[in-house]
């Protein structure tokens, strides 16, 4: 019986590796890794002699910076998660004491170190991304208390900064071309809508904790319409730019991807709470596919500023 008591989860002093990995949420790493890759492709620069930068940059964007942001968010969201998702590592007790905070700090430091080793622009982008991650979750700023600010911070960090970093690193730390910057900005705006989709699963907990997510502020129907608009409008902007730049067939592909999303969005709007996950799972991939299509469209077409 004594051994049984000693080995109970409540007596654990250190988190299990599986709990740390769950805290870092590998499933969330894909968007910034993809955006970094899009930024790389948009330069049109050969990978020859630069593979180490590509690999290091992808690791920086996903398993480091994004993972750090997830740990930060879970630590400062532990009260909300105790209501919405009590099975998560911190509220469940599998991440004992202040270990959630320790992991967030350690991963932040390691991310800054890797960014510094890659290049000056990578370090600057890493610093900005991590500042947004901490300001998103940490009082007194806590951007996520307001859905407009919080979703914007995520969109900039996950898409815009990652895209910018990929372009800058591959171009030898030169400032990316104007078309690449414009695409990064537009897809960052679109990511604002994607982030809103994630808020439909936590409406009750957000209300109780005073988190002004867009579903709380605008109501379910209003937030759903806003999410669709924020996703679609930037993509139509991308379509227009590709036409101006003479990338006609890529513009046609963007239209087809938009059409597929619109079909799913019409279904989503009928019952946003139940169908947000479906749109995230099947509509968002069309959005991110458009990112790569547009990156290939501008690759090598334009010189740097």
Label each region the model flagged:
Residues 1-305:
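Multi-pass alpha-helical membrane architecture of UbiA-family
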């Amino acid at each position: 019986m004594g051994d049984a008591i000693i080995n109970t989860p409540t007596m654990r002093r250190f988190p299990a590796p599986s709990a740390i990995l769950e805290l870092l949420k590998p499933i969330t790493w894909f968007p910034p890794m993809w955006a970094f890759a899009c930024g790389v492709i948009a330069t049109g620069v050969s990978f020859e002699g630069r593979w180490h930068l590509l690999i290091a940059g992808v690791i920086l964007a996903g398993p480091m910076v994004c993972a750090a942001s997830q740990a930060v968010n879970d630590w400062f969201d532990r009260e909300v998660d105790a209501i919405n998702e009590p099975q998560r590592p911190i509220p469940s007790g599998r991440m004992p004491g202040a270990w959630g905070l320790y992991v967030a700090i350690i991963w932040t430091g390691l991310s800054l170190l890797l960014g510094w080793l890659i290049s000056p622009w990578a370090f600057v982008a890493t610093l900005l991304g991590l500042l947004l991650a901490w300001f998103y979750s940490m009082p007194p700023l806590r951007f996520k208390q307001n859905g407009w600010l919080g979703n914007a911070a995520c969109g900039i960090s996950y898409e815009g900064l990652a895209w910018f970093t990929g372009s800058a690193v591959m171009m030898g730390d030169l400032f990316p071309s104007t078309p690449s910057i414009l695409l990064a900005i537009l897809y960052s705006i679109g990511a604002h809508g994607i982030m809103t989709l994630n808020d439909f699963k936590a409406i009750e907990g957000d209300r109780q904790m005073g988190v002004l997510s867009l579903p709380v502020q605008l109501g379910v129907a209003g937030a759903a319409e806003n999410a669709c608009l924020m996703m679609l409008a930037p993509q139509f902007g991308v379509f227009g730019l590709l036409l101006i730049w003479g990338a006609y067939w890529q513009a046609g592909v963007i239209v087809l991807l938009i059409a597929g999303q619109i079909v799913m969005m019409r279904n989503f709007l009928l019952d946003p709470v139940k169908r947000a996950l479906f749109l995230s799972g099947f509509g968002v991939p069309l959005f991110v596919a458009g990112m790569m299509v547009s990156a290939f469209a501008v690759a090598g077409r334009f010189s740097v500023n």
